[in-house]
Amino acid sequence: MSGAEKEVVVMTVPSTRRAFFGFAAGTIGALVATRVPVIAAPVQPASSARSFAQETLAGPFTLPLLDYATSALEPHIDQLTMEIHHGKHHQAYIDNLNKVVAEHPEIGELSVWEVLTDLTIVPEAVRPAVRNNLGGHVNHTIYWELMTPKSLEPSQALVDAITRDFGSIEQMQAAVNEAGLKRFGSGWAWVVSNSGTLSVTSTPNQDNPVMDGAGFPIIGIDVWEHAYYLKYQNKRADYLTAWWNLINWRTVDQLYSLAQEASATPTA
């Protein structure tokens, strides 16, 4: 690292449960509370998410539709990986989540975002299943919308925020890749926004950053082996490097804007 470069700190930013309930009350909760197929608009891929702000665990949840063909992300992510990852793995999280909700209808009135930010409100007997499967559904819904075969440039506001907090887009990417490589076993690497400040973190399994108060995710990369192993085998670093060729900056822009709106919303 040269003297002109800014040191990037991979960190978890503490936040209060009360602050994250501000997310639940605002538009930001929309992204994760999907119960119907989500077909993203070509100009604003995440815009359809706003309509789901009030969704609960009542279900049934269904698999979001992709806004591109399963072959469209090649050569960076192969078609078979996409078919299995989306159609099998994500579907399994949804099936398991629907089973839990059907067997425990008392949790149906809880909002998706409320549960993510405070899993203790879910009965202990089903908490692990909700954590893993709701987290898996939410994380993958974000992941699909963060990829596109035809990426555009990020907005100047987003570039300015990234430059302020990381030094450059390239330094941010390097920090995310490092977090993904250091995540032992299965998990995710994230860029999160917490009160307008961007940082990098990672989570195990299907945990979402809001579960531990790190912030609202604006970029998330799946580093489970099922996301890359057919093409990259044990070369997770190659997958992480290639993934940035697919990033949908329009989605990142919108998630960052939603995070900004939420942080500006009074939580009292």
Regions found by a protein language model. Give the residues of each.
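An amphipathic alpha-helical core segment
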Residues: 178-233, 241-250
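All-alpha RGS (Regulator of G-protein Signaling) helical domain and cognate RGS-like helical scaffolds
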Residues: 56-60, 76, 88-91, 99-109, ...
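N-terminal secretory signal peptides and thylakoid transit peptides that target proteins
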Residues: 5-31
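A generic secondary-structure signal for well-formed alpha-helical elements
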Residues: 24, 28-32, 93, 97-105, ...
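Mature N-terminal segment immediately following signal peptide/propeptide cleavage
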Residues: 59-95
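Hydrophobic/aromatic-rich, well-ordered segments within soluble, folded domains that form packed cores
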Residues: 85-93, 138-141, 219-229
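N-terminal targeting pre-sequences for secretion and organelle import
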Residues: 238-268
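C-terminal segment of N-terminal export signals and the immediately downstream linker at the start
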Residues: 34-73
